């Protein structure tokens, strides 16, 4: 029985991956999830420079439900979820914060989802030097 508990713990750890990504000013990072035969989640904490904001471009391919594949983004207290529809889903999200959380969940190799994170320099305001 003790061995079964160890195996379950190892499986749970192996199916979730957390990654910290620092996108340099005016840079870009690909967010491609680790995909297994079963359910897997890849989580990113994306940060950028103080004078920048983050722009995400995400896509979910397929006609499955949110139970099969999804992308969740969190910017402060605001959370959004992108799921497949009758056709492929695509979204672009612009975040004010310098830190964004992204999680991609898949339940098999047939489900496709990915994002690109861009760091955009904030434009100077008219009263700034």
From Swiss-Prot:
What tissues has this protein been observed in? Expressed by the venom gland.
Q: Where in the cell is it found?
A: Secreted
Q: Where is the secretion signal located?
A: 1-18
The record places domain CUB at 19-121
Organism of derivation: Platymeris rhadamanthus (Red spot assassin bug)
Q: Which domain of life is it from?
A: Eukaryota
Q: What is this protein called?
A: Venom CUB domain-containing protein 1
Per the record, the similarity remark reads: Belongs to the venom CUB family.
Q: Which UniProt keywords apply?
A: Disulfide bond, Secreted, Signal
What Gene Ontology cellular-component terms does the record carry?
Answer: extracellular region
How is the polypeptide modified once translated?
Contains 2 disulfide bonds.
Q: Does the keyword Signal apply?
A: yes
Q: List the disulfide bonds.
A: 66-83
């Amino acid at each position: 029985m003790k061995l079964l508990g160890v195996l379950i713990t190892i499986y749970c750890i192996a199916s979730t991956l957390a990654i910290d990504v620092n996108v340099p000013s005016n840079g870009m990072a690909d967010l491609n999830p680790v995909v297994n035969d079963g359910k897997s989640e890849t989580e990113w904490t994306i940060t950028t420079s103080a004078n920048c904001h983050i722009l995400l471009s995400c896509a979910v391919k397929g006609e499955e439900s949110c139970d099969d594949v999804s992308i969740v983004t969190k910017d402060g207290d605001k959370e959004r979820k992108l799921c497949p529809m009758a056709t492929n889903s695509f979204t672009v999200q612009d975040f004010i914060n310098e830190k964004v959380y992204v999680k991609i969940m898949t339940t098999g190799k047939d489900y496709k989802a990915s994002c690109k994170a861009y760091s955009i320099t904030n434009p100077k305001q008219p009263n700034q030097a």
